A protein has these predicted regions:
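C-terminal structured domain segments
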Residues: 196-232
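Active-site beta-strand-loop-beta-strand hairpin of nuclease catalytic cores
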Residues: 110-118
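Interdomain/boundary linker segments immediately adjacent to catalytic/signaling cores
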Residues: 1-73, 77
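A short mid-domain helix/strand-loop element embedded in enzyme catalytic domains
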Residues: 70-77, 82, 87, 112-113
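A short acidic/basic microdomain associated with nuclease active sites
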Residues: 80, 85-103
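Catalytic cores of nucleic-acid endonucleases
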Residues: 123-207
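Charge-rich, low-complexity intrinsically disordered segments
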Residues: 218-254
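A short, glycine/Asx- and small/polar-enriched loop/turn
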Residues: 102-105, 112
Length: 254
């Protein structure tokens, strides 16, 4: 299949990267890729018919029309597409297991090459005062710090464990066991330090129909500045320009 996300990652050193992702349209190849991955992303390994899954996702987006939940869901879905294309194993499903909503806790929990990665996705519109990939990166990092320190009153590892235990996710036993340990440690007040975690902060700016490319030189400078005081084991930063919030919903309804 044709590669959908073609811009090569920018190396930050020490096997850390910035991933520049530009979504200007959903053409036939991109649409085929969504159809190929939408079931895995939303439900895991099931036999649900693709049109039914598209309808379910579309109805969710329509219910949340005009809210930050809609924006966040579209941004996250595109992130999951990118991660799947680049070989990361999704250890969760997009939808909350208990209700018709997107999942809680971490925005994603991935594995690749025996390493585990936690995702935090932040998004906004180009018309928002002061918006930038740098500001959204700092916001995502701050939220990850809070989540792993119990600053929000929730156990994100418990949620990740519940998703990994969901049979259609097909998580390996060692992944499930590790998440169970992390969840129990968290409940006991033993928190994982952020410098020992692999982070996937994702920043999406919706361009409201007026396209412009990401300035990679300026982006690299901004990201390096933002990371000066940040701690992590490894980091992959996803910076996304999405032409329109409606691109995905329009595809789902055609």
């Amino acid at each position: 299949m044709t590669k959908i996300f073609k811009i090569p990652p920018i190396c930050l050193g020490n096997n850390n990267f910035i991933h520049v992702i530009e979504i200007q349209t959903i053409d036939q190849d991109f649409g085929n890729f969504i159809n190929e991955k939408i079931r895995l992303i939303t439900e895991g390994s099931t036999d649900t018919e693709i049109p039914k899954i598209k309808k379910r996702l579309c109805e969710f987006l329509q219910r949340k029309k005009g809210t930050t939940i809609e924006m966040g869901a579209v941004a996250e879905f595109m992130v999951h597409l990118y991660m799947n294309e680049n070989g990361f194993k999704q250890e969760f499903v997009f939808f909350n297991l208990e209700e018709r909503s997107i999942k809680k806790g971490f925005d994603g929990y991935y594995t690749i090459n025996d390493e585990e990665w936690i995702l935090e996705s932040k998004s906004g519109t180009i018309s928002t005062s002061g918006i930038s990939h740098k500001s959204k990166l700092l916001e995502a990092y701050s939220d990850l710090e809070k989540k792993v320190k119990d600053s929000e009153g929730n156990n994100p590892w418990r949620n990740a464990y519940n998703h990994a235990c969901h049979r259609p996710v097909e998580s390996a036993e060692d992944i499930i066991k590790n998440l169970k340990t992390l969840a129990e440690d968290f409940d006991s007040g033993v928190y994982k330090k952020i410098e020992n975690l692999n982070l996937l902060p994702a920043t999406t700016i919706f361009l409201e129909g007026n396209w412009n490319n990401i300035d990679q030189i300026a982006l690299l400078t901004d990201i390096k500045t933002a990371l000066t005081t940040k701690k992590f084991k490894g980091i992959n930063i996803l910076c996304i320009h999405n032409k329109s919030l409606e691109l995905l919903e329009n595809f789902l309804t055609t």
